[in-house]
């Protein structure tokens, strides 16, 4: 189930959004066998590579603060949370493949939290539901999911996986 969260638009969120949309954030091209390439800035590296999550960006603390403030504003993190991985993903419109492969991010229990920094479309699908994002939307879900390319401009989002206690 996709849960739409209240975005408190805290100072951390506003600064994080500015960083994500800046022209100075280093982005890395991520190729795909299916043709749906994208650009990414890893904030917290996934544990599957080194067996533990670890920050790899100077901006990690800012984005974790924005995540925590959003969870707290929605009464979801009374006992804390753990960010498993986080990155800024940027997808441009393009001809060819329009949908990513359906996938689950980890083989252990987790939820996904997405923050949408642009208003260009690019739906997110989870199980049998879909979310057509607006700028500043925040959603929480678990399960198999995939995304659609935007039809115009660049789709910039925070992608994170969490364990909430």
Name each region found by the language model.
Residues 92, 117, 143, 162-164:
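Short beta-strand segments enriched in hydrophobic/aromatic residues
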Residues 100-103, 146-153:
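Short beta-strand His + acidic residue motifs that chelate non-heme Fe in jelly-roll/DSBH
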Residues 1-81:
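Non-heme Fe(II)/2-oxoglutarate
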Residues 73-95:
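A short glycine-rich, His/Asp/Glu-containing loop-to-beta-strand
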Residues 96-101, 108, 116-134:
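A short beta-strand-loop-beta hairpin characteristic of the jelly-roll/cupin
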Residues 93, 131-146:
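Conserved metal-binding segment of the jelly-roll/cupin
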Residues 113-115, 153-165:
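A short hydrophobic beta-strand segment most commonly corresponding to one strand
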């Amino acid at each position: 189930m996709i849960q739409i969260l209240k975005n408190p638009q805290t100072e951390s969120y506003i600064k994080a959004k500015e960083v994500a949309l800046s022209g100075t954030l280093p982005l890395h091209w991520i190729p795909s066998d299916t043709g749906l390439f994208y650009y990414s800035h890893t904030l917290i590296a996934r544990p599957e590579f080194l067996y533990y999550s670890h920050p790899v960006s100077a901006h990690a603390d800012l984005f974790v603060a924005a995540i925590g403030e959003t969870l707290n504003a929605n009464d979801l993190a009374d006992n804390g949370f753990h960010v498993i991985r986080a990155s800024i993903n940027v997808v441009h419109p393009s001809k060819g493949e329009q949908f990513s492969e359906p996938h689950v991010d980890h083989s252990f229990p987790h939820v996904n939290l997405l923050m949408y920094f642009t208003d260009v479309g690019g739906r997110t699908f989870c199980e049998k539901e879909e979310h057509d994002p607006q700028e500043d939307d925040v959603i929480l879900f678990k399960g198999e999911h995939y995304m659609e390319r935007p039809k115009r401009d660049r789709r910039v989002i925070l992608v994170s996986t969490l364990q909430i206690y």
